[in-house]
């Protein structure tokens, strides 16, 4: 960049301002990255807990399913699963975490609306259906938490790349420009000082010679 910049005092001031801006930007990005890292590790705990919860409710649901098949027959369970199948509604909103857009999913409270008569269905089959409803809730929670985790992780990487670009490329480049401009300005100042000294020396030498000439002329007149 030094070869593309004009080595003037105004350019030096502009480069100093750019350096201050870049350094401030790097500091802000590092603070954002640190905050995101803290949020990331908190979400890791939530994600692990959600996964553990999913494993627990899944195990319980399959235990209920096996019991239902044993007591109420596989045909009855399959018939109930077809009768009770349908859409699973969730409420999703977008929230911002340090500028990162992430989904916030709310699971509405389940209501016991069924397409079958409980009189004709065994208690274990109904329990299995209820337990698998809990599995769906756990899956949604895992998906929401891991989506947040992934997006924040991506933002951490992006922010780190921006910090590295500023600290390793932009800021050193501006510092090189400042050193180059200062070097040229210092050289010009030295040259100007040297030129002034030479001019001053010539003027003094000329004045001295003129004084000598005047003195010589005065001596000649006195002798006449």
UniProtKB/Swiss-Prot annotation:
Signal peptide: none
Alphabetic keyword roster: ATP synthesis, Hydrogen ion transport, Ion transport, Transport
Record protein name field: V-type ATP synthase subunit D
Annotated Pfam families: ATP-synt_D (PF01813)
Function statement: Produces ATP from ADP in the presence of a proton gradient across the membrane.
Native organism: Deinococcus deserti (strain DSM 17065 / CIP 109153 / LMG 22923 / VCD115)
Family, as annotated: Belongs to the V-ATPase D subunit family.
Residues in coiled coil: none
Basic and acidic residues bias spans: 205-214
Spans annotated as Disordered: 205-224
Polar residues biased stretches: 215-224
GO MF annotations, alphabetized: ATP binding; proton-transporting ATP synthase activity, rotational mechanism; proton-transporting ATPase activity, rotational mechanism
Gene name linked to the record: atpD
